[in-house]
């Protein structure tokens, strides 16, 4: 298991414990089993390796038969598309879109902090518009069931878990601008974007505005603004105060 995944697992457990919802819990590396005070049981997997449709069905079948709700959370940098991508779903994504109300979950790590967020697969068919949601509120963890009737391979009623309301695919609630809004704007991002979105935007803008590649006389100044915004946002995600 990667060190970052260990950090994410530790952060996940502590965050759920802090809600007061957990009665008992057990962890085994990237797998975390919680019994909630509501009586529900949730098994969360932090996924850092390729997951096949057969793997998904195995976990869903085994856990559902035991009355345990399953939640997969994926290493975002490796497995999940960037925000606003128009993306042809891989087989495992399409399978989870079918059973999880067109929602995946991702995690990112910065320093000793970890961040968990939904990834919405907007649209219909195999090609979807990707939309990263706001960071999850651990107090909203819940179990629910999803019945699949139209897909023979996935047919059945599955015990699942997620954050927020049972119907996840909805726009995030409006909120006031944060003090970091101007730095997100420099990178061409909406306020409070995810760390993954920040990294992707920085890489794209660095390729476009780096003085070694861009002959524009203002490229050096623009690149300095981009670097400053990126460093301040990273400092925020890592839990330090930027100067």
Role assignments for model-derived ranges:
Residues 163-213, 217, 223-243:
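N-terminal J-domain/J-like co-chaperone modules of DnaJ/Hsp40 proteins
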